[in-house]
């Protein structure tokens, strides 16, 4: 038989038995016998008590029978199928306790692996700070590392890579803030040190959008800075890729600094647009962001061709009209390897609608490069288990490459009911 998801090999047929090993996804094991043991959670809130005594390499122990599937003659065909991504965003220390210690992160990753998750997106760029000690930040006269992590003497990115790889996880650092600088009201953020990098609106004020103050993502110096951070991550750490959030964006009210307006005049021969939704002005900014996205893909793949350049944009049409994100264009022309649109909806009908709208402009062969971004809470409402499971089913039916859930803290909190239910829906 084959373990299709990460499962614990235990010394006894019990969830309290000593954990001998964590078997990564698709581990081949030899069945010795089926035994009755302590009960464990199964599907639909029920329980089972059937365990398999198995041999995995030189180790022998017990695995809950629920998490095994037949192998045999069809095993080679099964293993050749593209692996479904089952990802989880792990927020920064502002919203997650896993960064308190090496042991806390190890426990969190053990739980994820045991429940069948195979990819993590640890937050590493937030509120003007990097989680890792950054030579790029230091070179620009900025704090070398988030002071919380610096005081603790830890490098969360190195820990995530080291502990994640030990457990067979795909590790894709998440540069959450992108071209956003800091929350509105922050007293000593990035813009205090680099005021010339600010995105300006028509009144010459710093753009505030979504509760954040923004950098000018069309400023060549700002683009170079963020690009340097991305490359520092992929060059220094053994990651599987790097991911930008919906904040890899140009807010529609921004880009009114004189240098950007002058570049617009030279490129189009037109005066500054009277409206922020002017088609020519919007197209200029969309192309400016898309050019940076494409360039970063080229530079990342020069470091290592197998690295994944991933973006998690706001879904269409809002992402395009309000944030200048031509996300389906990025995927269709090969600028990115993976798209994780944030399809955060609180009903199945709304989810189906937004998914269809975002798949329609895509070439059908690109669908495996789309991973549905789902959330446990949308529009102020917690999602019901049945709703989330149906969204996962719809995503698979559409031929997507997997799902990613926002975020780790609510997923793994409490009784982990939803996390276990989602495991039962694995592809």
PLM regions and their residue ranges:
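Boundary regions of SH3-family modules and the immediately adjacent low-complexity/disordered segments
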Residues: 14, 43-84, 88
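Aromatic-lined carbohydrate-binding/catalytic grooves of carbohydrate-active enzymes
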Residues: 115-152
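Catalytic domains of carbohydrate-active enzymes, especially glycoside hydrolases
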Residues: 103-130, 236-240, 335-338, 398-402
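Substrate-binding cleft of secreted/luminal carbohydrate-active enzymes
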Residues: 335-353, 358-361, 365-427
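Active-site-adjacent "subsite" loops/lids of carbohydrate-active enzymes
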Residues: 80-102, 172-236
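Beta-loop motif signature
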Residues: 2-49
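Polysaccharide-binding and catalytic clefts of secreted carbohydrate-active enzymes
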Residues: 194-329, 333
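Glycine-rich, aromatic-flanked loop segments that form ligand/cofactor-binding clefts
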Residues: 117-127, 154-207, 243-246
């Amino acid at each position: 038989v084959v373990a299709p998801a990460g499962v614990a090999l235990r010394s006894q047929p019990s969830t309290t038995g000593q954990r001998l090993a964590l078997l990564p996804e698709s581990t081949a094991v030899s069945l010795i016998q089926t035994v009755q043991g302590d009960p464990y959670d199964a599907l639909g809130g029920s329980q089972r008590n059937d365990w398999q005594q198995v041999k995995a390499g030189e180790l022998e122990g017990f695995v809950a029978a629920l998490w095994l599937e037949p192998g045999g003659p069809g095993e080679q065909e099964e293993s050749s199928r593209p692996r479904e991504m089952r990802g989880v965003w792990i927020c920064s220390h502002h919203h997650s306790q896993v960064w308190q210690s090496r042991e806390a992160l190890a426990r969190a990753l053990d739980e994820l692996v045991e429940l069948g998750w195979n990819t993590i997106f640890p937050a590493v760029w937030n509120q003007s700070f990097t989680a890792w000690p950054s030579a790029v930040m230091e070179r620009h006269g900025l704090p070398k590392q988030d002071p919380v992590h610096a005081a603790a003497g830890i490098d969360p990115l190195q820990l995530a890579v080291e502990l994640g790889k030990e457990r067979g996880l795909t590790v894709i650092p998440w540069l959450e803030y992108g071209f956003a600088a800091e929350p509105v009201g922050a007293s000593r953020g990035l813009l205090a040190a680099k005021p010339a990098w600010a995105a300006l609106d028509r009144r010459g004020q710093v753009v505030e959008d979504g509760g954040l103050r923004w950098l000018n993502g069309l400023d060549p110096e700002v683009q170079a800075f963020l690009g340097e951070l991305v490359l520092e991550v992929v060059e220094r750490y053994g990651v599987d890729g790097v991911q930008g959030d919906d904040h890899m964006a140009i807010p529609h009210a921004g880009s009114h600094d004189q240098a950007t307006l002058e570049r617009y005049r030279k490129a189009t021969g037109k005066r500054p647009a009277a409206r922020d939704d002017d088609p020519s002005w919007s197209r200029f900014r969309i192309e400016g962001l898309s050019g940076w996205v494409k360039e970063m893909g080229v530079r990342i793949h020069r470091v290592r061709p197998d690295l994944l350049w991933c973006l998690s944009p706001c879904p269409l049409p809002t992402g395009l009209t309000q944030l200048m994100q031509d996300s389906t264009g990025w995927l269709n022309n090969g600028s990115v390897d993976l798209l994780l649109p944030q399809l955060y909806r609180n009903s199945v009908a709304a989810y189906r609608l937004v998914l269809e709208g975002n798949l329609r402009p895509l070439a059908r062969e690109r669908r495996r490069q789309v991973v549905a971004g789902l959330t446990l809470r949308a529009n102020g409402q917690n999602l019901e288990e049945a709703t989330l499971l149906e969204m996962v089913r719809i995503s698979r039916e559409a031929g997507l490459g997997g799902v990613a859930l926002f975020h780790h803290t609510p997923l793994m909190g409490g009784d982990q009911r939803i996390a276990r239910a989602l495991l039962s829906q694995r592809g």
